[in-house]
Design a protein with these regions (language model features):
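Extracellular beta-strand-rich solenoid/capping regions of secreted or surface-exposed proteins
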Residues: 74-81, 91-112, 119-145, 151-182
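Active-site-proximal beta-strand/loop segments in catalytic clefts of secreted hydrolases
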Residues: 70, 87-89, 114, 124, ...
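Extracellular beta-strand/beta-solenoid scaffold signature
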Residues: 96-100, 123-135, 157-178, 194-203, ...
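Right-handed parallel beta-helix
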Residues: 107-108, 112-113, 137-153, 181-194, ...
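Extracellular beta-rich repeat passengers
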Residues: 282-398
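Bacterial N-terminal signal peptides that target proteins for export
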Residues: 1-7
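Extracellular "leader-to-stem" segments immediately downstream of a signal peptide or signal-anchor
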Residues: 7-8, 13-85, 91-97, 357-398
């Protein structure tokens, strides 16, 4: 395989993709306001177009509608409110609540927490899902920011045995945010922990996504939960405490950059991954990851209540069809810091890196080549890997 030729083709495709039109966007729904027009401070009236990544999302121009309960949130959703401001903690109930945005009516949407960092969606998933749209159409221009997403362990333990593909699978599909067939999305200053699938995912030919200044981790209570229920994930039984996965970009080989139509351009910058992660992000897209902190400082080494190994199996995984450029990231005590895991032997992938720092890491780690061409076409400023330890305190909701 001529990897230099492959990379030239991949980067050329990237630049062509960036030069394409952003796509049409629909006007916000004029339905009557639900709840109250917000007197709470939104983070910004309108966000800048430079996200430090592939996204140029600005979200909604509408006035924000404040929601402070599950009833408020669902009423705002049913009224097609495009700018929702979350105030305080909202609980989705013991059986979990998924709010699904499934049509292009949801183009130009902002969901954000009020300033102060106290906005929480507990047992609630925000799912932007354009899977049923006509071919070539995605939901466009979505901003999610300044919110903490997390599950309630006792509620997940109390669910009936979860089996993939059955009616008892709400827990298996539970994430904080799921982006499916979404183009131009920005997830910023959020926190994700203790959800029973990946904490977040970007799949099904989504494109031009930036995830920034966010935290992804599991608590020690998750790691040591008892009872530790056994669930069936896609034909494989595994205990819940052992399902500690950060993020998925690209659902499978067919939903990857190289094999899925040169989509899934995703930037990850200024995020903290860990502690207590089993593994991932698993990356099958065209990924630029810079100034992230991969934190395995807790270094779990024991067994879960069901007898599974608590040890981290990787920190960042490159999957089939993925192109990953890792720049100025800090890996702290991570095990198998960067791992190549292909769906089939011989699948193409590419890994390039620059100025990463590996501090007290263990196990084998892939090593990347240096780019010979400019990897991205957007403006960004990468710091030094050592500066991330100071910057990490600015990550998460504010």
């Amino acid at each position: 395989m001529n990897w230099r030729l492959l990379m030239t083709i991949l980067i050329a495709n990237l630049l062509c993709a960036r030069g394409s039109a952003h796509g049409a966007s629909s006007a916000p729904d004029p339905s009557a306001a639900t709840g109250s027009q917000s007197s709470e401070a939104a983070i910004t009236a309108r966000l800048p177009t430079n996200t430090g990544g592939f996204a140029t999302a600005t979200g909604s121009d509408d006035s924000a509608v404040t929601v402070a309960s599950l009833a408020d949130l669902l009423a705002a959703f049913n009224a097609r409110q495009h700018h929702i401001l979350v105030k305080g903690e909202i609980y989705g109930g013991p059986r979990l609540t998924t709010v699904t945005f499934a049509t292009t009516d949801w183009n130009n949407t902002t969901i954000e927490g009020a300033s102060g960092g106290s906005a929480v969606l507990k047992n609630i998933q925000l799912k932007f899902d354009g899977e049923m749209l006509p071919a070539g159409k995605n939901i466009q221009n979505v901003v999610i920011r300044n919110i903490t997403f997390h599950g309630v362990i006792r509620d997940l333990q109390a669910l009936p045995a979860q089996v993939y593909g059955t009616s008892s699978n709400a827990g298996i599909n539970y994430e904080g945010v799921s982006l499916r067939r979404v183009t131009n999305a920005w997830v910023d200053h959020c926190a994700f922990y203790d959800t029973s699938d990946d904490l977040m995912s970007v799949t099904l030919s989504s494109d031009r996504v930036t995830v920034s200044y966010s935290r992804f981790y599991f608590t020690s209570e998750w790691l040591t939960m008892h009872p530790d229920p056994m669930w069936n994930w896609a034909g494989k039984n595994q205990d819940l405490a052992n399902e500690r996965l950060a993020m998925l970009v690209g659902a499978n080989r067919q939903d990857s950059y190289a094999y899925g139509g040169n989509r899934l351009h995703v930037t990850l910058h200024h995020n903290q991954f860990g502690p207590n992660l089993k593994g991932r992000p698993l990356l099958r897209g065209w990924i630029h990851a810079y100034d992230n902190y991969f934190d395995n400082g807790a270094t779990p080494t024991g067994l879960t209540a069901a007898g599974s190994d608590e040890t981290q199996y990787n920190a960042l995984q490159i999957g089939s069809g993925g192109v990953v450029y890792s720049e100025n990231n800090y890996f702290f005590r991570t095990n198998q810091s960067i791992q190549v895991g292909l769906d089939s032997p011989g699948d193409v992938y590419a890994f390039h890196e620059n100025a990463n720092r590996y501090d007290q890491t263990t196990g084998r780690s892939a090593r990347g080549e240096v780019f010979s061409l400019a990897p991205v076409g957007y403006a960004y400023r990468a710091g030094t890997a050592s500066s991330i330890l100071k910057a990490v305190q600015t990550f998460g909701p504010r």
